[in-house]
Amino acid sequence: MLQFFIMNKSNHSNILIIGGGCAGISVASRLKSLKSDLTISVIEPSDKSLYQAAWTLVGAGAYEKANTIKPMSSVMPNYVNWIKSYAESFLPESNTVKTSNEEYTYDYLVVCPGLKLNFDGVAGLKESLGKNNVCTNYDADMAVYTWECLKNLEGGNLLFTEPPMP
């Protein structure tokens, strides 16, 4: 059974979530539906919400890139305390997360900051993307290019790669 503690501190939340993407917002919504009196804070620096899952549809020509980008304020639930900053360090021994100018405490911490792409991890990939039919759906602009390449495909072999799961 989950136990929560009330503290007289404005920077304290029952649930502190790092990351305001699909995972962070889904977790916030699910937990709030299970226990409506939870205090939930989300540390998310971005003004934009990127619906990355739809980029495969953009790359297939079935969805518009513009529909995958929305103001963060339009998707962040109104019951969430949105902390518009980066999490800079974790202090688990004191249930604390530090940002550049503040400390936040929590009863439970959820860490889902999203992907950090590393196109430099494959020799020559970064320089090749966006030309000569080298595409990726891990970037909204490149997903548009994927569709351009597929529309103009006249034959040949296609090579698809998928990174292994951790």
Where do the PLM segments sit?
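N-terminal functional modules and adjacent low-complexity/disordered segments of proteins
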Residues: 1-2, 26
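FAD-binding core/adjacent interface of flavoenzyme oxidoreductases
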Residues: 2-13, 81-165
